[in-house]
Structures are given as structure tokens and as C-alpha cells.
Design a protein with these regions (language model features):
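Extracytoplasmic beta-rich repeat domains
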Residues: 142-144
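Edge beta-strands of extracellular beta-sandwich domains
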Residues: 166-177
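Extended substrate-binding grooves/exosites of carbohydrate-active enzymes
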Residues: 1-138, 147-168
Length: 178
């Protein structure tokens, strides 16, 4: 039983799961585990939180909780991966969503891969208001998982993803202090 259940790990798991489903048109039925977090007696895993991947804090509210849902138990927080499925399954509503938004700190001047879930035909990425990347398609099998190489700046960094229709999402990441 592991005390660390990072949302980003869940994202990678579901991205892989969805890609396999998209590449298997012969499947008559597919499902995901599970829509909502739910209580489980005698469970003490996934109880540690971190907003920087370095410092960890025990969160007693997550004790006795299966936290693998795509929405929290109280239905207040739609986890990143919820937007993967929203982008993939709902083509009527354009979605643009930057993942890893609860990982609020990263090392300054470091490059990293930013993931965006979107059913838009193309995306532009801005860093502090300056366009830094553009893509007209994703090679990923579901067609909704976009990866962009971006770089943190020295101070607070605001990344914004924008579709041609103006649908957008943005996150602010702060520099990790040594």
C-alpha cells in the first residue's frame, strides 16, 4: 500500500488506457475505474499530498479513501483526467485543459513537457503572454492529448493554451525555492 498517489501518475495511466482503447476498434465495451473517489475501511494509501513533488504532507482527510476516481468524493474537484474523457467523448463542446495544475512549483529555467487535453483542431501555447509553441495536430491515438516542450522562467510563469475559436485555459507555476 503506497502513500503516494500523484494525480500526474493517474493522468499517464488513463492516457495509456484511452490510447489502447482508441487503437482497438473491435472492443464492444470499455470502461474506466472509477468516476468518484469513495470510502474504504482500513485503507491508508494515497494519503500524502505535495504541490512541488519534493515536500510531502500527510492529508488526514484522505485516510480511508480510494482516491482513484476522476472526480473527488465531495464532487467539488474534477481531476485532470476528467478533462481527458470530456475532450475525447464530447465533441460538441470544445475543451482546452492544461494538466498538472496542482503541481504549483517547478525549478526555475527548467524545460518540461506540458500536457493539454483538448478536442480543438490546433493549439497555441503562450508563456507570460509570448507565443512559444503551436501545433496543428496531435499524434496521440485519441486525438486529444497534446504535448508541448516548454520552459519555466525565473519568476512566476503563466502558461496559456488557446484554440483557434478562442477557447483557452491557463495555469500559473511558481519557481521552486532551493
Amino acid at each position: 500500500t503506497d502513500s503516494l498517489h500523484f494525480e500526474e501518475y493517474g493522468n499517464r495511466f488513463h492516457e495509456s488506457h484511452a490510447a489502447q482503447i482508441a487503437q482497438s476498434p473491435y472492443l464492444n465495451f470499455t470502461s474506466l475505474w472509477v468516476l468518484f473517489d469513495f470510502p474504504v475501511a482500513e485503507r491508508e494509501e494515497g494519503i500524502v499530498d505535495s504541490d512541488n513533488g519534493v515536500d510531502f504532507v500527510v492529508n488526514p482527510e484522505r485516510k480511508y479513501l480510494n482516491d482513484k476516481g476522476i472526480v473527488t468524493r465531495d464532487r467539488k474537484l474534477f481531476k485532470d483526467v476528467f478533462y481527458l474523457y470530456k475532450s475525447w467523448w464530447n465533441k460538441d463542446v470544445e475543451t482546452v485543459y492544461i494538466t498538472a495544475r496542482r503541481l504549483k512549483y517547478r525549478p526555475a529555467n527548467q524545460e518540461f513537457v506540458m500536457t493539454v487535453y483538448s478536442n480543438a483542431p490546433s493549439l497555441k501555447i503562450y508563456c507570460n503572454g509570448v507565443e512559444v509553441a503551436e501545433s496543428t495536430k496531435t499524434e496521440e491515438p485519441t486525438g486529444v492529448v497534446w504535448k508541448f516542450n516548454v520552459k519555466m522562467v525565473t519568476g512566476p510563469t503563466v502558461f496559456k493554451a488557446v484554440s483557434p475559436n478562442g477557447t483557452s485555459d491557463e495555469i500559473e507555476i511558481l519557481p521552486l525555492q532551493d
